[in-house]
């Protein structure tokens, strides 16, 4: 998409504002809105200056100036703003060099794609993430010196079977772990998801399906088609934006927290991926599960670096409340065809062109640019160093006896473990200057503040366990 096309969109749709969007280190989209009349030739060459010191984990106040460089190919109409507004995604550049800022997630993703091409291994990596989310009616939480609490409510929640409502309790709701695929009225989110799909398609995503997920209280998923890595990361941000805003329009509140409910399934973001060169799928072959030797080496790299990857794919303290056995959480670092208890699955496909792997431990609070790039770099390290993943595990890993289970490596058990693993195992990420030691150090420092904050806060459960001891 060219400047001319952007200008024609502005004229055709009587656009009044341009919303410049970028993603911070934690994966949250930020934005800056400017009048549409500021868009001209210079705008796409010079960008828009902004204060980078206001973004956590980025610049200090003494060197705060940074450049938002709009990517004209990402222009699309915003479906929610009152005034006609055009969204344009931006890379964050250093003003002195006009090169991608080494801590900018989107620039890191683009450098990873460039590194893939320069390696000669492949020219394209495809990603297909599957973010899950909850829709609640009401969420309240409190954290201050006087105490801490949270409360979740939703008309669909299993705990509301005996709740009195003004117009009566209709009784149709999914029980704990009983939400997968029921028809309405048990599935109360059908129309909300359909609206999400309509808007996602208007914004360029290709929707493949939508459905209720396993958990009670409104766990849902919209499945969208794969794309190249940075484009799919852009689409993941669009996906989250649409989910949260459509929920708001319907009087609901959406969360991508991995584990908001105790005792029911959490939300994951399984990541499907494959490599290709000159249009040929390099993961298709005659090895286990129809994979190529290259694909097996890629899996070997993911398994070898999994705990370091967890720092990007599972970047919150809440992430590790999902990654526990017994809740369809893939904690064991093994691979298998079809077996959903393994952390890496080889899906059944209709043709060899669709051959791919599915990494199942990521969750939807991952920054998609960083999580996708880190997984690619781990896989490429596996290919370069011919890291074989060993034998596949086709048995149900959730039911293994303890003596067998302890022989299988697992993902990190906490955010602190994951951050320490990344600190010790980072070299594979720095190949080709994709990640820098500076960007990794800044990431570690930012997320360690989360670990420390949670560590220092008394938990309500501790009062139940210890108050009268």
From Swiss-Prot:
Which segments constitute the GS catalytic domain? Answer: 105-469
Lineage, top-rank taxon, reads Bacteria
For the keyword Ligase, the answer is: yes
Q: What compartments host this protein? A: Cytoplasm
List the EC numbers from the record: 6.3.1.2
Q: Name one GO biological process term.
A: glutamine biosynthetic process
Residue numbers of O-AMP-tyrosine PTMs? 398
- Stretches assigned to the GS beta-grasp domain: 13-97
According to the record's subunit comment, the protein's assembly and interactions are: Oligomer of 12 subunits arranged in the form of two hexameric ring.
Question: Mind telling me what this protein is named?
Answer: Glutamine synthetase
Q: Which organism is it from?
A: Proteus hauseri
């Amino acid at each position: 998409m060219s400047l001319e096309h952007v200008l024609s969109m502005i004229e055709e749709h009587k656009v009044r504002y341009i919303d410049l969007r970028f993603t911070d280190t934690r994966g949250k989209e930020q934005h800056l809105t400017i009048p549409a009349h500021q868009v001209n030739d210079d705008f796409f060459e010079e960008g828009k200056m902004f204060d980078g010191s206001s973004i956590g984990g980025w610049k200090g106040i003494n060197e705060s100036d940074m450049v938002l460089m709009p990517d004209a190919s990402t222009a699309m109409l915003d479906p929610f703003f009152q005034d006609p507004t055009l969204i344009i995604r931006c890379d964050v550049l250093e003003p002195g060099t006009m090169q991608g800022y080494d801590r900018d997630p989107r620039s890191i993703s683009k450098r990873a794609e460039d590194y893939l091409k320069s390696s000669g291994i492949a020219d394209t990596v495809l990603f297909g993430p599957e973010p899950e989310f909850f829709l609640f009616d009401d969420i309240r939480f409190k954290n201050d010196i006087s105490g801490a609490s949270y409360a979740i409510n939703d008309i669909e929640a299993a705990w509301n079977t005996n709740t009195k409502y003004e117009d009566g309790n209709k009784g149709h709701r999914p029980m704990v772990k009983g939400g997968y695929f029921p028809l309405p009225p048990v599935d109360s989110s059908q129309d909300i998801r359909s609206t999400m799909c309509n808007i996602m398609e208007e914004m360029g995503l290709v929707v493949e399906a939508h459905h209720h997920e396993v958990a009670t209280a409104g766990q849902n998923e919209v499945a969208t088609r794969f794309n190249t890595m940075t484009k799919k990361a852009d689409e993941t941000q669009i996906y989250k934006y649409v989910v949260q805003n459509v929920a708001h329009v319907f009087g609901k509140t959406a969360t991508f927290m991995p584990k908001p409910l105790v005792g029911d399934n959490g939300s994951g973001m399984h990541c499907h991926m494959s490599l290709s060169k000159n249009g040929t799928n390099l993961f298709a072959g005659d090895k286990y599960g129809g994979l190529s030797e290259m694909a097996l080496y890629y899996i070997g790299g993911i398994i070898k670096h999994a705990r370091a990857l967890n720092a990007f794919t599972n970047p919150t303290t809440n992430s590790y409340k999902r990654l526990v056995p017994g809740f369809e959480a893939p904690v064991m670092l093994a691979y298998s065809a079809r077996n959903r208890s393994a952390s890496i699955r080889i899906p059944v496909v209709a043709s060899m062109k669709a051959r791919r792997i599915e990494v199942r431990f990521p969750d939807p609070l991952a920054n998609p640019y960083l999580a996708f790039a880190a997984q690619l770099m781990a896989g490429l390290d596996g290919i370069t160093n011919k890291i074989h993943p060993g034998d596949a595990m086709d048995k149900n890993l959730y039911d293994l006896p303890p003596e067998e289970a302890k022989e299988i490596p697992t993902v990190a058990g906490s955010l602190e473990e994951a951050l320490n693993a990344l600190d010790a195992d980072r070299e594979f990420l720095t190949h080709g200057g994709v990640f820098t030691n500076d960007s990794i150090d800044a990431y570690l420092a930012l997320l360690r503040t989360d670990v420390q904050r949670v560590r220092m806060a008394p938990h309500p459960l501790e009062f139940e366990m210890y108050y009268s001891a």
